[in-house]
Amino acid sequence: MTKGVGRGKGRWSWQRALAVAEETSPKERKMKLGIVGLPNVGKSTLFNSLTKAGALAANYPFATIDPNVGVVSVPDERIEKLGELYHTKKVTPAVIEFVDIAGLVKGASKGEGLGNQFLSNIREVDAIVHVVRCFEDANVVHVDGNINPLRDIETINLELIFADIEVLERRVAKQTRAAHNDKKAAKEVDMLKRLIAHLEAGKMAKTFELADEEEEELYAINNLLTDKPVIYAANVAEDDLADDAASNPHVQAVREFAKEDGSGVFVICAQIEQEIAELDDDEKAMFLEDLGLSESGLEKLIKASYDLLGLMSFLTAGEDECRAWTIKKGTKAPQAAGKIHTDFERGFIKAEVVNYKDLLEYGSLAAAREKGLVGMEGKDYVVQDGDVILFRFNV
């Protein structure tokens, strides 16, 4: 919900605000997850299943940007219920872009497989979903002959480390020339050499300690692969799903590694996800119930991604559209308004806020307001997950 004050007119203009939001919302930046994994771990099966399931789960149009990129909707019953409440013309969920990172295999940094082709796809993702094989199957040969997910993790991590070292060495060469008469460049070279030594020791960039804020700024320029958040997708056999693979030693090893690494982990069966992708919503619910599951792998991955990246959603609602908007936890009202349109942030006045559950319970914003459940919040208000917001702005 967005309200604008027409310039010099002193009145609320719903039409203009909604038209602006409708016009600009498709350009909203999507969260982007890159899916990596060695051959025969289930990576491509999982990618194909998730993108197809995400396309069927909601009315957001599935988009295949190229054979390795798919956009899926984030399941969110809150906007569906708001859509029913407002008899809205359009329900728009938040979306995630999945990228199937091809060619990231052992020796890729030295030209094996597709060589460094994977770099162009993985560099801009927000987080990496690393599919690791945690199932035994004699009919599916592992590239290294046996199942060892920690070895597989190390193999992929080393390729990312080598790619980062190459980027940093080029940066060092460039900045060394400037360092003769530039103190900031000299400081950057010193930091980069320490960072390269850190990586050469087999450590990820995310564990590198920076001395001060200036180093943090210089570090961020490089957009390093080994600094990206990682979610491990433990691909298991169907029998391991019911108890979340509690007795699977491979999964336990991954969980322990992820805990030390500060990464996320979730259990999934790519083969089951492939079957789920072919079902409609009712069939999917019955299928999951038969398996003793409450949610699909796509839903588990989305939750793990939101948790790891510190994300949440606020909602806007009206007769024309009900929509979920993804923001970082801790985002203040003006910046949340800016997700819809920069004018909303620039001309922010107030945010009329009601909790999603309260709005549903009382049936309208007016009724919730009468109960004292609607707050008029200023620029310092920190938006909460599930807030339904009516922005007031003046431009």
Functional labels for PLM-detected ranges:
Residues 12-112, 116-137:
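Conserved G1/Walker A P-loop phosphate-binding module
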Residues 62, 76-79, 92-98, 112-126, ...:
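Amphipathic alpha-helical transducer elements in NTP-driven molecular machines
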Residues 53-61, 68-70, 78-81, 110, ...:
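Glycine-rich, flexible loop/turn motifs
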Residues 42-47, 75-87, 115-139, 151-160, ...:
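Phosphate-binding glycine-rich loops and adjacent basic patches that engage nucleotide phosphates
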